[in-house]
Amino acid sequence: MKDVKALKLMTLNDVLSQINGDMTLGIGTGSTMELLLPQMAQLIKERGYNITGVCTSNKIAFLAKELGIKICEINDVDHIDLAIDGADEVDPSLNIIKGGGGALFREKVIDEMASRFVVVVDETKMVQYLGETFKLPVEVDKFNWYHILRKIESYADIKVERRVNEDVAFITDNGNYILDCKLPKGIDPYKFHEYLIHLTGVFETGYFLDMADQVIVGTQEGVKILEK
């Protein structure tokens, strides 16, 4: 049986086939992209592609630079041709939860900007409903984070925790906190997103709804390509 890393690597050829000679590329954050990015950089170099990357986190920007990928800031481009990113959960409608790496705000900005958004996952990320195996991240202001937490818990039977890293509050690249929400089955993601996004102090949610153009899934039986 193949492990998760092997399942992700199975998707490599399908990911690389999306990249062509002259494009602005949105580069996602997380373990999947860290695994695939060196191969993407090698392809760009070998074929002499004129690729400019727009990165979703400081960490992935540092890695891309080390690999020789030309990068720029989001405000230096007026379009993104293709965004490639991982996901924490994907439901049967190809709706997604992201934000396990804490970069959900920048990821959503870049993925929404892209003409095409391709998601790469292994089969363990496929779920029947969003929140089945992964908590929903919500990026919030430090000032009133606890009051936001209480309001989220009052919405339904939702357990909310402020994310910590080695006993210290996790801080996003934007200087905010992350609240991780354990969702019960039956939560409507569209309605819950609307509730959250209208709370003062909420910057963004980890719901990526109706955004993915294609999901590439590494499975024990091979690679599956899912599209709406």
Swiss-Prot record:
Enzyme class: isomerase
Amino-acid positions noted as binding substrate in the UniProt annotation, renumbered to this chain: 29-32, 85-88, 98-101, 125
The entry's keywords: Isomerase
Any single Gene Ontology cellular-component annotation: cytosol
Gene3D superfamilies linked: 3.30.70.260, 3.40.50.1360
Catalytic activity: aldehydo-D-ribose 5-phosphate = D-ribulose 5-phosphate
Active site residues per record: 107 (proton acceptor)
Source organism, top-level taxon: Bacteria
GO molecular function terms attached to this record: ribose-5-phosphate isomerase activity
Biological or metabolic pathway of the protein: Carbohydrate degradation; pentose phosphate pathway; D-ribose 5-phosphate from D-ribulose 5-phosphate (non-oxidative stage): step 1/1
EC number(s) recorded for this UniProt protein: 5.3.1.6
GO BP of this protein: D-ribose metabolic process; pentose-phosphate shunt, non-oxidative branch
PANTHER family linked: RIBOSE-5-PHOSPHATE ISOMERASE (PTHR11934:SF0)
Primary role: Catalyzes the reversible conversion of ribose-5-phosphate to ribulose 5-phosphate.
Family in the record: Belongs to the ribose 5-phosphate isomerase family.
Subunit (UniProt): Homodimer.
Name this protein carries in UniProt: Ribose-5-phosphate isomerase A
Provenance organism: Staphylococcus aureus (strain MRSA252)
Protein encoded by which gene: rpiA
